Amino acid sequence: MRFRKWAPLISAVFMMSCFTACGGGQSASATKIALSANGVSVEGAAISADPDDAVYLSRETINTDKNGDGGASSAQTEVSVIHITSPGTYRLFGTLEEGQIRVDLGEKAAKDEKAIVTLILDNAHLRCTVAPAVLFESVYGGSSEENAAKTGANILLAEGSINTINGSHGAYRWAQGAVSSRMSLNIGSEEDVVGTLSLTADQEGICVEDRLTVNGGKIRISAENNGIRMNKSDSVAEVNGGDVHIAAGLGGSGGAVDTEGQLLLSGGTVIAVGGDKDPVLRGGNGVFVNGGTVVALGSPSEGLAADSEQVTMELRFDEEKELKDTIVVTDAEKNAVFAYDPAADEILSGSPRIYTAAMISCEAFSEAEMYRLYLGGRAEGSSAGGVYDMSAVTAYSGGTEQAFCITEEQNESGGVLLSSGESTSPSGTAVPSRFTEFYLGSKVNTFFGIADK
């Protein structure tokens, strides 16, 4: 096997790795649930209070204890809980204040392939300050890769809809998100005009035990802690499509995606901004970038996998960067191949952030090429959520070059790092699988490279 190596010219660390995508679908006929301050209706009739019905309403008192001591800080809040107890598709619209959508199909649901619920959010606005706003407690598991498309918990964003979820967290580990699921969860959008979901969380944004699959939709997550949290070592978080922007760690700690298992980025756009204490992306069993556009800004990501499919650039800066300037990557001729303007990303509006590491990947990157990184300046063209459509960018000017790198062939036995015109041969260290170790100046010791397929 052959390797390629970067030749950086500043103290930023580059990592090239060979780190594929589905969309949403049309929904079946659905039971309509109308939400309002004047009451909840199901198919035009007032919602039932009978637990034997497929959809019913209860009022529950939730104890909140901010200090965990049961003292004067404790309070009780009454919450409206809309229970869904039968498989099917449910279309929600309107506003639910201090309420929760709870899906529980019973103890045997986990192994019942018919125990599937799809919530279509059709201009729905859900708010709960003391618990998850959406809670999938018991549905079909469907956690294996083969059954990912047949997951029991599904959220579908209605065509052209604008939806908001503002939620808290529960007492259980699996219920720490504004949207929480004890089983696997799929999120997508109806076709044609993409639906939007803006999610705000006082803890985790989305918390799933087994498998989270995002297939489509415009999704914006603002979270005090992690944007997406997966608790199990065999869990999988996967993005196949859609436009996902995450601002995490707003409370100081937390990453954009934190999974004990695998993180698979296979399509769509993912913009991830984390806090300054935890990795912006972390996969206990690997972070795989296989397709799409990925920008991760914050503390260095953890678990980047070498046996992935898309060329990825990782940079670690010697000093903090304020997240305000356009980030541009050009080719050797200084033609822009990637551009992102955080000032145009609505999820970062009014939220000053810093970063010490950046991970960038897009389909335009290829092996054996030279790239330049710029911060600042102005790109002429159209962008969506700060990400530029490179086919429409006509010019770029005014930026400050941070570094450039060149890939060239190198064999497994070692090689040289070209830095400030000097050559240095690695010695006395083991060569990690799929990577060659290099030294960058006197401060940095890191791995970077890309393996030929």
Give the label of every model feature segment.
Residues M1-I10:
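Bacterial N-terminal signal peptides that target proteins for export
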Residues C22-K453:
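A composition-driven surface/loop motif
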Residues S17-A21:
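C-terminal motif of bacterial Sec signal peptides marking the signal peptidase cleavage site
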